[in-house]
Protein backbone atom coordinates (compact mmCIF):
# COMPACT_ATOMS: atom_id res chain seq x y z
CA UNK A 1 0.00 0.00 0.00
CA UNK A 2 2.79 2.59 0.52
CA UNK A 3 3.52 2.48 -3.22
CA UNK A 4 0.08 4.01 -3.89
CA UNK A 5 0.58 7.09 -1.70
CA UNK A 6 2.32 9.33 -4.32
CA UNK A 7 -0.27 8.34 -6.93
CA UNK A 8 -3.07 9.19 -4.50
CA UNK A 9 -1.49 12.56 -3.75
CA UNK A 10 -1.20 13.28 -7.48
CA UNK A 11 -4.86 12.36 -8.04
CA UNK A 12 -5.93 14.57 -5.13
CA UNK A 13 -3.88 17.49 -6.48
CA UNK A 14 -5.39 17.04 -9.96
CA UNK A 15 -8.93 16.90 -8.59
CA UNK A 16 -8.40 20.03 -6.46
CA UNK A 17 -6.94 21.93 -9.42
CA UNK A 18 -9.87 20.87 -11.63
CA UNK A 19 -12.36 22.00 -8.98
CA UNK A 20 -10.61 25.37 -8.70
CA UNK A 21 -10.62 25.79 -12.49
CA UNK A 22 -14.33 25.00 -12.74
CA UNK A 23 -15.09 27.38 -9.86
CA UNK A 24 -13.10 30.17 -11.52
CA UNK A 25 -14.79 29.62 -14.90
CA UNK A 26 -18.26 29.46 -13.34
CA UNK A 27 -17.66 32.61 -11.30
CA UNK A 28 -16.33 34.43 -14.36
CA UNK A 29 -19.44 33.61 -16.39
CA UNK A 30 -21.92 34.03 -13.53
CA UNK A 31 -20.66 37.53 -12.71
CA UNK A 32 -21.42 38.69 -16.25
CA UNK A 33 -25.03 39.77 -16.81
CA UNK A 34 -26.99 37.63 -19.25
CA UNK A 35 -27.98 40.66 -21.34
CA UNK A 36 -24.35 41.39 -22.23
CA UNK A 37 -23.94 37.77 -23.30
CA UNK A 38 -27.05 37.80 -25.50
CA UNK A 39 -26.34 41.19 -27.09
CA UNK A 40 -22.78 41.52 -28.41
CA UNK A 41 -23.17 45.27 -29.05
CA UNK A 42 -23.46 46.07 -25.34
CA UNK A 43 -20.53 43.75 -24.70
CA UNK A 44 -18.37 45.57 -27.26
CA UNK A 45 -19.39 48.97 -25.85
CA UNK A 46 -18.51 47.78 -22.34
CA UNK A 47 -15.11 46.51 -23.53
CA UNK A 48 -14.44 49.81 -25.33
CA UNK A 49 -15.43 51.75 -22.22
CA UNK A 50 -13.04 49.60 -20.18
CA UNK A 51 -10.05 49.91 -22.49
CA UNK A 52 -10.50 53.42 -23.89
From Swiss-Prot:
Its main location: mitochondrion. It is found in: Mitochondrion membrane. GO terms for cellular component: mitochondrial membrane; proton-transporting ATP synthase complex. Keywords: ATP synthesis, CF(0), Hydrogen ion transport, Ion transport, Membrane, Mitochondrion, Transmembrane, Transmembrane helix, Transport. It is a single-pass membrane protein. The chain crosses the membrane at residues 6-26. GO terms for biological process: ATP biosynthetic process; proton transmembrane transport. F-type ATPases have 2 components, CF(1) - the catalytic core - and CF(0) - the membrane proton channel. Belongs to the ATPase protein 8 family. Mitochondrial membrane ATP synthase (F(1)F(0) ATP synthase or Complex V) produces ATP from ADP in the presence of a proton gradient across the membrane which is generated by electron transport complexes of the respiratory chain. F-type ATPases consist of two structural domains, F(1) - containing the extramembraneous catalytic core and F(0) - containing the membrane proton channel, linked together by a central stalk and a peripheral stalk. During catalysis, ATP synthesis in the catalytic domain of F(1) is coupled via a rotary mechanism of the central stalk subunits to proton translocation. This is ATP synthase protein 8. It comes from Albinaria turrita (Door snail). The lineage of its organism: Eukaryota, Metazoa, Spiralia, Lophotrochozoa, Mollusca.
Amino acid sequence: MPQLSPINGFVILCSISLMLLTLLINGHFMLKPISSLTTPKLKMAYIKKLYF
